[in-house]
């Protein structure tokens, strides 16, 4: 069994929605990124890659590569899963914490969990997503961006 941790941050930029966990959420800003900016799926991908000792998403999907410009992070997550399966691992469970002052995440968490479970080929009860604020402290508290911490447990397939 292996455990991996992932962390990602994206700052807010011009736009009217963000994508988190594959879910499009209306917001007064977008997220600045080379891909679609799905900070949740990026942190999960890093946790999974880390657990399998496969590096990080920057190694697999560099932001200097034009083929990943605007990339759908769900496609990237499914690619990560193939890499993990190729090393003889399967997902035991994943757990993520979204750190954001806004927008409110609670109405979207069930949909995020469902899409992540679908992409990782696991049951819904193997995926947890939660959200918190920093009580208006730090860059997330000032609504300058969003951060996500993620943990993944891999089991031998």
Curated annotation (Swiss-Prot):
Pfam families, sorted: YgbB (PF02542)
Keywords on record: Isoprene biosynthesis, Lyase, Metal-binding
GO annotation terms (biological process): isopentenyl diphosphate biosynthetic process, methylerythritol 4-phosphate pathway; terpenoid biosynthetic process
EC number(s) on file: 4.6.1.12
PROSITE patterns, per database record: ISPF
CDD domains: MECDP_synthase (cd00554)
Record-listed 4-CDP-2-C-methyl-D-erythritol 2-phosphate binding positions: 8-10, 34-35, 56-58, 61-65, 100-106, 132-135, 139, 142
Keyword Lyase in record: yes
Binding site for a divalent metal cation: 8, 10, 42
Enzyme class per UniProt: lyase
Residue numbers marked as site, Transition state stabilizer: 34, 133
Metabolic or biological pathway, per its Swiss-Prot or TrEMBL entry: Isoprenoid biosynthesis; isopentenyl diphosphate biosynthesis via DXP pathway; isopentenyl diphosphate from 1-deoxy-D-xylulose 5-phosphate: step 4/6
Cofactor: a divalent metal cation
Family: Belongs to the IspF family.
Subunit: Homotrimer.
Function: Involved in the biosynthesis of isopentenyl diphosphate (IPP) and dimethylallyl diphosphate (DMAPP), two major building blocks of isoprenoid compounds. Catalyzes the conversion of 4-diphosphocytidyl-2-C-methyl-D-erythritol 2-phosphate (CDP-ME2P) to 2-C-methyl-D-erythritol 2,4-cyclodiphosphate (ME-CPP) with a corresponding release of cytidine 5-monophosphate (CMP).
Protein name as it appears in the record: 2-C-methyl-D-erythritol 2,4-cyclodiphosphate synthase
High-level lineage: Bacteria, Pseudomonadati, Pseudomonadota, Gammaproteobacteria, Pseudomonadales
Gene name as annotated: ispF
């Amino acid at each position: 069994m292996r455990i991996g941790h992932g962390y990602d941050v994206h700052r807010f930029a011009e736009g009217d929605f963000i994508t988190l966990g594959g879910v499009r959420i209306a917001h007064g800003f977008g997220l600045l990124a080379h891909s679609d900016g799905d900070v949740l799926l990026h942190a999960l991908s890093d946790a999974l890659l880390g657990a399998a000792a496969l590096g990080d998403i920057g190694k697999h999907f560099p932001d200097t590569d034009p083929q990943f410009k605007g990339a759908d992070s769900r496609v990237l997550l499914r690619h990560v899963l193939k890499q993990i399966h190729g090393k003889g691992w399967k997902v035991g469970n994943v757990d993520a914490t979204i750190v954001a002052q806004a927008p409110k995440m609670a109405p979207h968490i069930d949909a995020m969990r469902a899409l992540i479970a679908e992409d990782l080929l696991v049951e819904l009860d193997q995926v947890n997503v939660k959200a918190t604020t920093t009580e208006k402290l730090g860059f997330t508290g000032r609504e300058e961006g969003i951060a996500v911490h993620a943990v993944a447990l891999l089991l031998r397939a």
